[in-house]
Swiss-Prot record:
GTP binds at residues 10-14, 103-105, 136, 163, 181. This is Tubulin-like protein CetZ. GO terms for molecular function: GTP binding; GTPase activity. SMART domains: Tubulin (SM00864). It comes from Pyrococcus horikoshii (strain ATCC 700860 / DSM 12428 / JCM 9974 / NBRC 100139 / OT-3). The keyword RNA-binding does not apply. It is found in: Cytoplasm. Its main location: cytoplasm. Belongs to the CetZ family. HAMAP family: CetZ (MF_01946). The gene is cetZ. GO terms for biological process: cell division; microtubule-based process; regulation of cell shape. Keywords: Cell shape, Cytoplasm, GTP-binding, Nucleotide-binding.
Amino acid sequence: MRAIIIGIGQCGTKIADIFSLVDFEALAINTSKSDLEYLKHIPPERRILVGESIVGGKGVNANPLLGREAMKRDLPMVMKKISSLVGYEDVDIFFLTFGFGGGTGAGGTPVLAEALKEEYPDSLVVAIGALPLKEEGIRPTINAAITIDKLSRIVDSIIAIDNNKLKESDEDISQAYEKINYAIVERIASLLALIDVPGEQTLDASDLKFVLRAMGSFATVGYAKADATKIKSLSRLIIRSFENEGLYLDVNLESALYGLVAIHGPPEVLKAKEIFDALSELSQRIRGKQIFRGFYPDPREREVEVVTLLSGIYESKSIENIVITAKRYAREFMKAKEEGEMKKRELLKGLPDFEDIYPGEVDEG
C-alpha cells in the first residue's frame, strides 16, 4: 500500500516531519519560511513555501482567509510538486496533516483536498487534524468549526485528534504538542505498517480504503500496548483500544459504521478465543457491525500492540463542543460588533459636514 503524507501549516508540517523520520513519503507546505527551515527530516526539495507574494514568507498569523488565498495562488506549483513525487505509481491514500485552529492549515487544507480529489479520483484523501486546546481561546475554536464544515464536504474521512484528551494537567502547550504529534504518528504508522503484511489473517489496502471511504464523516484511531509477559487478559487489552481511554477523540462508539483492528505480538499470547471475544464485543457495539481484522503473530516481539480504526462516526462530544462553542463565540462577537456600530452611529449622529461649517471658503471654480 502506498500512502503520501502532506503536512500543511506549522502543526501539519511538524507531524509530516515525524512521518518522514519513520520512512514515509512526505511533503511540507507552509506560508512561514522559518517554520519550513526548522524541519529536520523532510528533504528541502519537498518543502513548499506558498503565499510568499501575500505574506512574504512570514506566515498568516492564524488567519484562514490568508491561508486559503496563499494555497489558491500557488496551487499549480503545489500540484506540480505532488505530481513529481507521485510519479507513475498509484497512490492509495493521501493523508493531509494540519491543525484545525491555525491559519495556513485551516485555510489551505480544504483547497488542496479538493484539488487532490479532482486530480487523483482513484485515491482516497483523508484529513488528519489536531483540534485546538481549550487554552488557545476563541479564534482557533472558530477556525476549527468552520474547517470541519468545509472538509466534511470534500474528504473521504476526517481523523480528528482531540488534543485536550492527550494533554496532561502539568504540561505546557509546547510540551503537549510535541507528545501529541509523536502519538499521532505512532498510531497511524503502526496501522499502515501492517497493511499488506503476511499474517495469520491479513489486512490489505482495499480493507483500509473501504473503512476510510466514509463520505466525510469522522474517524478515530485507538491504541493499546503492553508487555506480553504482563498481560492478564488479551481481551481487555483489545477492548481498551476502542474504549474512551484508548481513543484520541471523544466519540459515541455506537454511531460508528466500520471498524478495523490490527493485533501484533508474540504468537503464544495471541489466543484466538480472547481475540474473538473482544472483536465480538466491538461488532455488537458499533452501528455498522462491520469489522475488518488482522492478526500478526511475530516470535520476535516482546509486546502486544493493538491498533483500532473506527470510521463513519457522526456523533462526537469533542466535535460537538468545538462547534457549539464556536457558534456561541460567533454570536457574541457579531452582537458586540453590531452594538459597537450602533453606539458609534448614535455618538456621531447630527454632526455637520465641513461645508456646513466653512461655507464659501473654497472656490470650486
